C-alpha cells in the first residue's frame, strides 16, 4: 500500500489499526487514516479536516493553505455572524466495519457544536473496499428553547478544495467544460463574484471559453445532473497520467427544490451544495428541534493514462449516479447515520401516466405533500424524487422512502402542471400507480410565443452558443453585461406574432431599466423603451365571432423584486412585491403582483431557469378587435432595489412562454379579475419563458 511521503506522520506510529482484505484504518496522535491499495486519505485531528488525498501515489490536494489543500470538508452560513467551518475542537471518531456483502469499510466522523447557539454540524465520510472515493453524509441540528428561531440555514456544503496545480480543467456537464482560468483573482471585478480577464490573452480559459469568469457560469440544473468535477490532463501529474475528482449525484432525495433547482457545482473547488439561496432558491429556517441529514453523495477519484480524455473519466464517474448502487452498503452503515432510512423502509414507485397530446420530455416528481416542490424547505423530513416518463407513459423510481407525497407532472410544449396530493407510497401497494393529465384549456389557442419548458433559454442570449470562443458555451452562462440591451433593441421590444423571431426579437430578461451598476461597459443606466414590451398580433372576424372571453397566459422562469434573495421577510421599499401589468389595446388593464418570497437573482447570475410560476389574465373578448391588436407588458419604470454588493439594481423578470386563447359561450369575467396559477401555498415569481393567448 502506498504511504504518502508528504504527510508520512499520518501513517506512522499508529496507536490503533484495523484491516480487512485490502482496506486499512489507522490512528495516531495527529491523524486518522483510511486507505486501500490505491486510495488513501488522512484527517488532521488539529482541525478536523481531511488534509491528504492520494490516488496511485499522486497527491490530489496539495499543501494546506488556509482552507485550501483540504477536503472534502463541511461548512455553512448558519451562525449569527455568518459562515462557520467546523472542525477545530470537534468530536472525531474512526469507524470500522464489514458490510452485508463481506466488504470492509472505514469511516471518519466529525461533529462540532457552536457553543453560543447549541447548533451542531456533523459529517461522515466512508471508504468501502477497493473503491477510490468517499461516501458523504452531513447533518445539522438546532436545539435551543431560549432562542427558538435562530436564522435561516443560508448555505450548507461540502468542498473538495485543492491547492495543487495538478487540476487543469473543469467539467459541469457533458456539454460544458473548459480549462481552469489562470488569473481570475487578478482581473477587473465587474460585479460581485465576476471578473473580466479578457486582457490575459495567454490564459487558455480566455482563448477557449470566455473573457469573463464567475462561478455562476459553472452552475447546473439538477434535473439530469449526474456528476461534476475537476480534470487533470496529465501535464502536471507526476507520471503524465490523467486524473479526475468528481462529485456524483447518486441520490437526490435530500436536496431541495426538485428537478428545477440549479446551483454552483465547480470552479477551482468541487462543491456539493446541500443548501443555498442561489438563483432564488428558498432555504430552511433554523428553529428549535431542527434535525436533518443530507446524503449520500459520492466523491469519486479516478485515473487514466496520457491518452484518456476528460469525457472518458467523466463517463466513468457517471456510472455511479444510480440510487440503487451500493444499497447493501448503505443499509449496513444505516445505524451510524441518524435519519437515514434503510431498504426495509423503501420501495419502488412505478406506474403509467396518460399524457396530453404533444407532451415532450415529460417528468414525474415525488415531493413533500401539499407543497410546491420548489419550496420544499419547511419540513425537516421533506424528501424528493423524480424520473423521466418514457414514450409509453411509464415511469419507475427506485428506493423511495415510504410515505405520503405530492405528485407533480410537467412536460415541454404543455402549459401548466399535473398535481395530485396525498399519494401514499407503500411497499404493500401491489398495483402500479396510474395518473391521467389533461392539459389546461380555455378555448381555442390563437397564438403562442416561446416553448413551455420552464426556462427563458429560447430567447436572445439564452441557450444559443457563444460562437466567439471555440468551446462555445451557452450565452446565458456568460456575464449579462456583455450583452448591451440598447444595442440589441434600440427601439425596445416590438414583437409581432407570426413574423418576429423569438430567438432574436425577445430578450431573455425583461428589465425595468438597463443598469449601469455592476456593468463595466456602461457608465449610465439606460431607460428608453426598456420597461414596456409590446406584443402585436392579428385577428380575423371569424376568430372573434361568437366569443365572450379572452385569456392571456404567461409563465415565467424567474423574477427579481426589490427583496433580492431575501425570502421570508419583506424588505422596506416600494417594490418588494413587483407589479407586472398587461394593457390590451388601451381598453383593458390588469396587474399581476409578484410576491417577495419568489424573488431571486437569476439572469444576472447566469441562469435562465429559476423559480417557475404562471398567471392567467381573463378579460372580455370585446377588448380585442379585427385586424391588429396590441398588448403592452410593463414593469414599473426605473424599478430598482438597494444592493449591498456590486450587483445590478434593476428589477426584472424572465418569461418562459406566453399565449392567448379565445373562449366562446361563456359569460365575460369581471374585467379587473385575473388569476394566479401557482401550486401549493402560493404562486408568485417572474422570469419569462413562454406566453400564449387564448381566445
Curated annotation (Swiss-Prot):
It is found in: Secreted. The keyword Cell wall biogenesis/degradation applies. It catalyses: Endotype eliminative cleavage of L-alpha-rhamnopyranosyl-(1->4)-alpha-D-galactopyranosyluronic acid bonds of rhamnogalacturonan I domains in ramified hairy regions of pectin leaving L-rhamnopyranose at the reducing end and 4-deoxy-4,5-unsaturated D-galactopyranosyluronic acid at the non-reducing end. InterPro entries: Carb-bd-like_fold, Gal_mutarotase_sf_dom, Galactose-bd-like_sf, GH-type_carb-bd, Polysacch_Lyase_4, RG-lyase_II, RG-lyase_III. PANTHER family: RHAMNOGALACTURONATE LYASE B, RHAMNOGALACTURONATE LYASE FAMILY PROTEIN. Belongs to the polysaccharide lyase 4 family. Pectinolytic enzymes consist of four classes of enzymes: pectin lyase, polygalacturonase, pectin methylesterase and rhamnogalacturonase. Degrades the rhamnogalacturonan I (RG-I) backbone of pectin. This is Probable rhamnogalacturonate lyase C.
Amino acid at each position: 500500500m502506498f504511504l504518502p511521503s508528504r504527510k508520512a506522520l499520518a501513517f506512522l506510529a499508529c496507536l490503533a489499526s484495523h484491516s480487512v482484505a485490502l482496506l486499512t484504518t489507522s490512528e495516531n496522535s495527529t491523524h486518522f487514516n483510511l486507505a486501500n491499495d490505491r486510495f488513501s486519505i488522512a484527517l488532521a485531528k488539529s482541525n478536523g479536516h481531511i488534509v491528504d488525498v492520494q490516488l496511485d501515489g499522486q497527491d490530489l490536494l496539495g499543501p494546506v493553505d488556509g482552507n485550501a489543500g483540504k477536503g472534502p470538508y463541511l461548512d455553512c452560513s448558519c451562525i449569527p455572524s455568518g459562515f462557520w467551518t467546523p472542525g477545530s475542537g470537534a468530536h472525531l471518531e474512526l469507524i470500522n466495519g464489514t458490510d452485508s456483502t463481506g466488504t470492509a469499510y472505514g469511516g471518519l466522523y466529525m461533529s462540532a457544536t457552536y457553543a453560543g447557539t447549541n447548533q451542531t454540524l456533523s459529517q461522515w465520510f466512508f471508504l468501502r473496499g477497493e473503491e477510490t472515493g468517499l461516501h458523504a453524509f452531513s447533518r445539522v441540528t438546532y436545539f435551543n428553547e431560549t432562542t427558538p428561531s435562530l436564522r435561516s440555514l443560508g448555505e450548507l456544503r461540502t468542498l473538495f478544495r485543492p491547492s495543487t496545480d495538478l487540476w487543469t480543467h473543469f467539467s459541469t456537464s457533458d456539454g460544458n467544460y473548459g480549462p481552469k482560468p489562470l488569473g481570475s483573482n487578478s482581473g477587473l471585478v465587474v460585479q460581485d463574484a465576476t471578473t473580466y480577464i479578457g486582457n490575459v490573452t495567454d490564459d487558455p480559459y480566455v482563448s477557449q471559453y470566455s473573457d469573463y469568469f464567475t462561478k455562476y457560469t459553472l452552475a447546473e440544473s439538477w434535473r439530469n445532473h449526474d456528476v461534476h468535477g475537476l480534470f487533470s490532463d496529465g501535464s502536471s501529474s507526476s507520471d503524465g497520467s490523467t486524473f479526475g475528482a468528481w462529485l456524483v449525484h447518486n441520490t437526490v432525495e435530500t436536496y431541495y427544490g426538485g428537478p428545477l433547482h440549479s446551483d454552483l457545482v465547480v470552479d477551482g473547488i468541487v462543491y456539493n451544495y446541500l443548501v443555498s439561496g442561489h438563483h432564488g432558491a428558498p432555504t430552511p429556517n433554523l428553529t428549535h428541534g431542527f434535525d436533518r441529514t443530507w446524503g449520500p453523495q459520492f466523491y469519486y477519484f479516478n485515473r487514466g493514462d496520457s491518452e484518456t480524455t476528460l469525457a472518458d473519466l467523466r463517463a466513468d464517474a457517471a456510472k455511479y449516479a444510480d440510487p440503487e448502487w451500493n444499497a447493501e452498503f448503505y443499509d449496513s452503515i444505516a445505524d451510524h447515520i441518524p435519519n437515514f432510512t434503510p431498504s426495509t423502509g423503501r420501495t419502488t414507485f412505478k406506474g403509467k401516466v396518460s399524457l396530453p397530446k404533444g407532451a415532450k420530455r415529460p417528468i414525474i416528481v415525488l415531493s413533500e405533500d401539499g407543497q410546491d416542490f420548489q419550496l420544499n424547505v419547511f419540513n425537516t423530513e421533506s424528501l424528493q424524487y423524480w424520473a423521466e416518463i418514457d414514450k409509453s407513459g411509464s415511469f419507475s423510481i427506485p428506493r423511495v422512502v415510504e410515505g405520503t407525497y405530492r405528485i407533480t407532472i410537467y412536460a415541454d410544449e404543455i402549459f401548466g402542471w399535473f398535481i395530485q396530493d396525498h399519494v401514499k407510497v407503500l411497499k404493500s401497494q401491489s398495483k402500479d400507480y396510474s395518473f391521467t393529465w389533461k392539459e389546461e384549456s380555455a378555448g381555442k389557442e390563437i397564438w403562442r410565443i416561446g416553448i413551455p419548458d420552464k426556462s427563458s433559454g429560447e430567447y436572445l442570449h439564452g441557450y444559443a452558443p457563444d460562437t466567439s470562443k471555440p468551446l462555445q458555451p451557452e450565452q446565458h452562462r456568460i456575464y449579462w453585461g456583455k450583452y448591451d440591451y440598447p444595442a440589441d433593441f434600440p427601439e425596445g421590444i416590438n414583437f409581432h406574432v407570426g413574423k418576429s423571431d423569438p430567438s432574436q426579437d425577445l430578450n431573455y430578461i425583461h428589465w425595468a431599466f438597463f443598469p449601469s451598476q455592476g456593468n463595466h461597459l456602461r457608465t449610465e443606466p439606460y431607460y428608453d423603451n426598456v420597461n414596456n414590451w409590446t406584443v402585436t398580433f392579428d385577428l380575423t372576424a371569424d376568430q372573434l365571432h361568437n366569443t365572450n372571453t379572452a385569456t392571456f397566459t404567461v409563465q415565467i422562469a424567474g423574477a427579481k423584486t426589490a427583496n433580492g434573495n431575501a425570502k421570508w421577510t419583506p424588505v422596506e421599499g416600494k417594490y418588494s412585491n413587483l407589479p407586472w401589468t398587461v394593457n390590451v389595446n388601451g381598453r383593458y388593464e390588469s396587474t399581476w403582483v409578484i410576491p417577495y418570497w419568489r424573488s431571486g437573482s437569476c439572469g444576472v447570475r447566469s441562469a435562465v431557469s429559476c423559480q417557475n410560476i404562471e398567471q392567467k389574465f381573463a378579460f372580455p373578448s370585446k377588448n380585442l378587435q379585427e385586424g391588429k391588436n396590441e398588448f403592452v407588458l410593463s414593469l414599473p419604470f426605473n424599478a430598482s432595489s438597494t444592493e449591498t454588493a456590486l450587483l445590478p439594481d434593476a428589477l426584472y423578470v424572465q418569461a418562459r412562454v406566453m399565449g392567448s386563447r379565445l373562449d366562446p359561450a361563456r359569460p365575460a369575467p369581471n374585467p379587473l379579475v385575473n388569476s394566479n396559477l401557482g401550486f401549493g401555498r402560493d404562486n408568485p415569481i417572474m422570469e419569462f419563458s413562454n406566453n400564449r393567448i387564448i381566445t
